[in-house]
């Protein structure tokens, strides 16, 4: 998602920087949301788009979820306060809803069932607290994507489609299960669009 987002920003009128723990790209500046001192690098930004997260089923120790997703949110908000950055876009997850009912909208109850959903929920609360300190002069956009798929991805969606294409897919039951998915370019395009939002609190599934 980050790469697609950056590619779309390059085609826009925005000046932007890429901040990451992976600095293999020569234009990337090292920033770790767990390290508040490294976040000083973003002090001149007018919009923060936080895509950083820990999301794997085999994360050890479990506290890594809290370190990145929760403490990272605290650090991002603190740097925004320190330098008067008034716009934050945060990619959360539909995992905050847990096993939600069909047609659950942005006002649905949070019934997370794992540490990923729990820490995304807590991060949302931290960002909301930051916004509510000065709601008339701050913008917060929370995006809750479902499974993101697209070219170059080798995750579960790719594996599923690959098995179907090779006629190796084994279906259990009647095959009536439905899965929500989001195309990576659509999510990236929305993030660019969200950079132009007015002050306020905006949440999107």
Predicted feature locations:
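Conserved beta-loop-beta element that borders a ligand/cofactor-binding pocket
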Residues: 125-151
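Substrate-positioning beta->alpha
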Residues: 153-159, 173-196, 202
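Conserved Rossmann-fold NAD(P)-dependent oxidoreductase catalytic core, especially the SDR/UDP-sugar
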Residues: 75-115, 133-138
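Glycine-rich NAD(P)-binding loop of the Rossmann-fold in SDR/ketoreductase-type enzymes
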Residues: 64-75, 110, 114, 118-119, ...
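N-terminal Rossmann/SDR dinucleotide-binding element
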Residues: 1-47, 51
């Amino acid at each position: 998602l980050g790469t697609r987002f950056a590619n779309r920003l390059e085609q826009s009128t925005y000046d932007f920087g890429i901040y990451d723990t992976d600095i293999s790209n020569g234009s990337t500046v090292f920033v770790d949301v767990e390290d508040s001192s490294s976040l000083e690098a973003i002090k001149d930004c007018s919009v923060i788009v936080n895509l950083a997260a820990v999301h794997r089923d085999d994360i050890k120790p479990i506290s890594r979820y809290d370190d990145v997703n929760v403490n990272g949110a605290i650090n991002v908000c603190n740097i925004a306060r320190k330098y008067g950055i008034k716009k934050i876009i945060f990619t959360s997850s539909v995992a905050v809803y847990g096993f939600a009912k069909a047609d659950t909208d942005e006002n649905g109850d949070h019934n997370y069932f794992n540490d990923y959903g729990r820490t995304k929920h807590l991060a949302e609360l931290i960002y909301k607290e930051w916004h509510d300190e000065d709601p008339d002069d701050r913008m917060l956009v929370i995006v809750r994507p479902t499974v993101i798929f697209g070219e170059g991805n080798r995750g579960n969606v790719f594996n599923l489609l690959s098995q179907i294409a090779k006629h190796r897919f084994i279906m259990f039951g009647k095959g009536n299960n439905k899965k929500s998915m989001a195309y990576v370019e659509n999510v990236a395009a929305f993030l660019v669009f969200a950079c132009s939002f007015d002050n306020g609190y905006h949440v999107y599934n």
